[in-house]
Amino acid sequence: MLSRPKPGESEVDLLRFQSQFLAAGATPAVQLVKKGSRRAGDANLEQPPLQDHRDVVMLDSLPDLPPALVPAPPKRARPSPGHLLPEHEDPEERLHRHDQHITAVLTKIIERDTSSMPVNLPVSSGVAFPPVFHRSQGRQGKPVTAGKRSIFAQEIAARRASGAKVSPVREVESILDPPESAMTCEALTPREWGSQPPWNSYSFQGPHLVTGKGLKGQEAEQEAQTIHEENVARLQALAPEEILQEQQRLLAQLDPSLVAFLKSHSCTREQAEEKATREQRPGRPSAEVIGKEAIAPTSASVPRQENELEPETPALALPVTPQKEWLHMDTVELEKLHWTQDLPPLRRQQTQERMQARFSLQGELLAPDMDLPTHLGLHHHGEEAERAGYSLQELFHLTRSQVSQQRALALHVLAQVIGRAQAGEFGDRLVGSVLHLLLDAGFLFLLRFSLDDRVDGVIAAAVRALRALLVAPGDEELLDSTFSWYHGALMFALMPSQEDKEDEDEDEEPPAEKAKTKSPEEGNRPPSDLARHDIIKGLLATNLLPRLRYVLEVTCPGPSVVLDILTVLIRLARHSLESATRVLECPRLVETVVREFLPTSWSPMGSGPTSSLHRVPCAPAMKLLRVLASASRNIAARLLSGFDLRSRLSRFIAEDPQDLALPLEEAETLSTEAFRLWAVAASYGLGSDLYRELYPVLMQALQDVPKELSSPPPRPLAVQRIASLLTLLTQLTLAAGHIAPEHNSHSAEASLLAGSSSVTWTQVSGLQPLVEPCLRQTLKLLPRPEMWSALGPVPTACLLFLDAYYQAWSQQPGLCPEDWLQDMERLSEGLLLPLLKHPSLGSLWDSLGCCSPLCNPQSCAVAPETISSLASLGCAGGHPPLSLAGSASPFPFLTALLSLLNTLGRIHKGLCGQLATVLAAPGLQDYFLRCVAPVAALHLTPFSAWALRHEYHLQYLALTLAQRAATLQPPMSGTDAALCHGMALALLGRLLPGSEHLAHELMLSCVFRLEFLPERASGGPEAADFSDRLSLGSGGDLGCGRGALLAQACQDLPSIRSCYLTHCSLARASLLASQALYRGELQRVPALLLPVPKEPLLPTDWPFLPLIQLYHRASDTPSGLPPADTVGTALRALQWVLVLESWRPRALWAVSPAARLARLMCVFLVDSELFRETPIQRLVAALLARLCQPEVLSNLNLDCPLPGLTSFPDLYANFLEHFEAVSFGDHLFGALILLPLQRRFSVTLRLALFGEHVGALRALGLPLTQLPVSLECYTAPPEDNLALLQLYFRALVTGALRPRWCPVLYAVAVAHVNSFIFSQDPNNSDEIKAACRSMLQKTWLLTDEGLRQHLLHYKLPNSALPEGFELYPQLPPLRQQYLQKLRISGVLPNGVSDT
């Protein structure tokens, strides 16, 4: 920087300074601007605009110039923009120039600069409400001039006068704090709110102190802007300490009273301006709670920063002036008035730290930076008071308030939060689960305590929150809409599948006994412990049911509370048989529900909302009874006999919904639930006596069905009512077809089934002519998908009724079979066969894959908020149309159609071939191919179990129809038969609890059906060739080839089936209950509530199940004697496994190769003689050969956990002990010992043999030519475990490992020892190098010339040679050099020959 001239410097020095300045090229401090003439206006075009950046609106769509209608006069010159025209210019030309077109105004609109204009905001008060007018103020003020002015007008005039007095002071305030006053008074546009610079950057928008008043036009603005820029530059150059010093100096020069007065008024006005600005500020868009970006601080943080700069802040002035007449106002307690201040400004998040979630009163998640007005009631005085919304912690705190309204509000908000969380509205915006957080915080017992409140509003809010927690939205709607499906009334218990040990021990008891007896451990466990595993069990342990009964019976709550309580009771009844029993046995609970909400007489109701539901029929009350009756046969009988449900069913069914004194929607729902309750009772064979009384009503309702269906479009409630009516008639028809058993069979069963059905066949025989026209009418809408979807389950219910009708007709002993056979032919020719050829039916088959849970697992995705201790179907978001539960699902109709076709084919065998043509549909074939393909097991959730059960029904019925056709008709094609067999195998391993009858029937009819094995005539040659190549001691006998074994297995299929029916038998009680359900034996049905599906009925390795059971029986038998028929069981199991390995490898895809190897080893561990049987030897050898194929061997992983085993090394240790004890050198046994010793498997297995069971080496006499895998699998890569190498060398040197005893492992040990003693890797540790030299020295000094020759001259493995490896005729040069180097260093002695 150049210095100023000093005294004594001459002009020469100044010229030198000038030359240096010009040479440096620096910017001069002063710029000379020549003021041009009028015509030189272009010189100022490049100057920056004086105003700030403002909104500019450009209308590009308008043309810049108007259409040239009249030619404009030629221009004489081009004037500059700032040049004034001379006086003699033509006015018309001036008008044309300045007013050409609308585009001159609208193409560019610039916002007016308001930065320098003062904004006078209204003076705000510091209190929440306007001050009270005191008469003393009238005496202190000026006398009123006009007598007619009101007090309000006088007060307004006084405020205006006081505002006029304060306004001149604002210019002085700007001197003290220009940035704050400027930014506070400026109204920013919404776009500028996010880009406002921070205060500490000293970036001001324009001059506000110097206005340039007194100068001309543009010169005033230019000079003011120049002075402002110089001021800003000086401020930016100053350090914060210098700014404080200047501020102190300025304050010292002014009067202290003036400074205090100005600051007190400035603070009051700034607070009012900030409050007004916040109210006008638009809300920011929602943002996530996590993952926030760093945001620059806004102008709202200015007061805090400036307060830090000020050395001391004067006390705030009171909003009112205390008078001496007022009491206790002599001392002002400001800390007690702190809550009346305005909220602090919203701090925007500077980092990506997670913030506490806050919710609105409607349960909505609020973004952390959302600035909401205070009148919404979302601001409070807790932590982060400037943020709107309530956190979960604050809501929990509010539930303990002494004010009942606050408790009710908190529970209401929590209920809304739970509902939105279950609906998946929060998504990934929250870290973790809201429901898990609430339950861990004790929300469940908070609700239970709130139910004991004395305030009705709190009880109502607690009941609503309890419903939101327990009842998942959409679950009941789904179950109601599928009630009329094939076995749609059956439902899995909605209880957690992951239970503690006490609950698992109870599963062994029958369901009825479990409901009555409760273990003392569970009775003594606290509710909190029970709720951690099962929420509903924990709630029931807190006496929830008596409290709900008290609320219903005594407090008489409003309609919404009644509906919530009934919905909660329905959810409790769906939990389990025990919960349903407790609901039934709760004193006066069911009586209250029946008496208050199912009366037989009531006052007529209007169409509007009602104030009370007591003494008014309610559909949820009827539904509660239906769900209770579904839990067990005993509960249904107690409900019918103890609560006079017959009269109530008659009351609500005998009268049309339009005639009931109820709203139409409620009347139809109530009638539908009455039909469903009767249908559930009829499923047990109960309530049939009502049929005679209500027969005319049912016939009339059935005759009205075509009229209801003809009204386009059908109403959903009417459709559900029709479907429920048809389901009721289906169950009554099955009851009519039931034949009472003879009393001389079993006394217990005879006494149980003594009361036979009171419905006879003649009473239901007239229903079929009325139902069949309804089916024909609905099938006409099949080509119209939108109308077909609107029909819902009506076509399905019609098909199921015809199925039950013909099934019951064929069971009548006194009727002529020719009648029903002819009627079946009529139905088949007139309705079913044309339907099977209809193109629209083909589209339904084609959509099976899209709607299948197996083919489309995403349709069974887990709900957003899933709790392990509370089971739910997770239907909050609904289901897409193309899903099993969707409106366009083909599963219900096609399942009912296949059920009817099976019944007709079973009764009339002549129709089976014609009806089986449905199996040739391309859509069904493609669906089977996708289901047979190996896929990962679907995770079982309550919804996936429910959906898979309905899908398995369709697959089972299609396979049953195929089996009937294959038995009666000519043989099926090989491709179709193999596909059906693969589908049957896949289905057998997937069936869930409750389908025991289906699994039993599959094993009886489809799985072991010879017609489904078309490969029986073509699989022999290939298997024989492979067996000859890998024969293990067979001597080349072609009779033991795999082809002969498979042929023998096909002949023994009946014996194989008997073996698996014995060893894969299911629980007898469950099997009998399932048979009664699927066969329509209503008198034997125990319950419609299925057990919890924890896993499929059969394990994935069910083909090996007989072998596993033999192994466990042998382990549990203390005497060591083998079980009876051990050889036969093992033989049949191995035969079936060989069939599957050869012809159905996909059936064993879920069983890993390591698990298959472990199961084969179990055959040798059963006893000491089983593996010596020749058939067992041949089958195990064939299976071992299949396991040693390259594509299977590459997937053999012995380190992965195996089902049923603690670890494979433990099994292998037992296998070695058994081999030492009983093998006697058996080659097949030895092959299984050698297979896990490959180099790529764990070294633990090789250490177990060479370390603990070295004596077994003498019995491992398996020849190299019979080794099932390549020898290179054992020798490569070189062994790197020093302990194992030392064991190899010790076994070789001591003679425990000899080529004539164990040729395979001898070659392996020689290869690894040779590679180790000649290894020269420089990266080896000193220990490895020392062990290598020691082993080589000992090898050099061996007296056994043969072993020494093998260890030194080993070349590479070769199983064709007797030794198993090739030798160098003489040492290679590298080995000779290495030996010479060691000989020179003294490691090897001299005088010993190298050859």
Curated annotation (Swiss-Prot):
GO cellular component, one term: nucleus
Entry keyword set: DNA-binding, DNA-directed RNA polymerase, Nucleotidyltransferase, Nucleus, Phosphoprotein, Transcription, Transferase
GO molecular function, one term: nucleotidyltransferase activity
PANTHER family documented for this protein: RNA POLYMERASE II-ASSOCIATED PROTEIN 1 (PTHR21483:SF18)
Family, similarity comment: Belongs to the RPAP1 family.
Assembly description: Part of an RNA polymerase II complex that contains POLR2A, POLR2B, POLR2C, POLR2D, POLR2E, POLR2F, POLR2G, POLR2H, POLR2I, POLR2J, POLR2K, POLR2L, RPAP1, FCP1 plus the general transcription factors TFIIB and TFIIF.
Gene encoding the protein: RPAP1
Name of the protein this chain belongs to: RNA polymerase II-associated protein 1
Biased composition (Acidic residues): 500-510
One Pfam family from the record: RPAP1_C
Feature: compositional bias, Basic and acidic residues: 85-96, 269-282, 511-530
Subcellular location: Nucleus
Region (Disordered) location: 34-53, 62-96, 269-312, 498-530
Source species: Bos taurus
InterPro entries: RNA_pol_II_AP1_C (IPR013929), RNA_pol_II_AP1_N (IPR013930), RPAP1/Rba50 (IPR039913)
Location (main, coarse): nucleus
Segments of skewed composition (Pro residues): 64-74
Role this protein plays: Forms an interface between the RNA polymerase II enzyme and chaperone/scaffolding protein, suggesting that it is required to connect RNA polymerase II to regulators of protein complex formation. Required for interaction of the RNA polymerase II complex with acetylated histone H3.
Keyword DNA-binding on entry: yes
Residue numbers of Phosphothreonine PTMs: 321
GO BP terms in the entry: transcription by RNA polymerase II
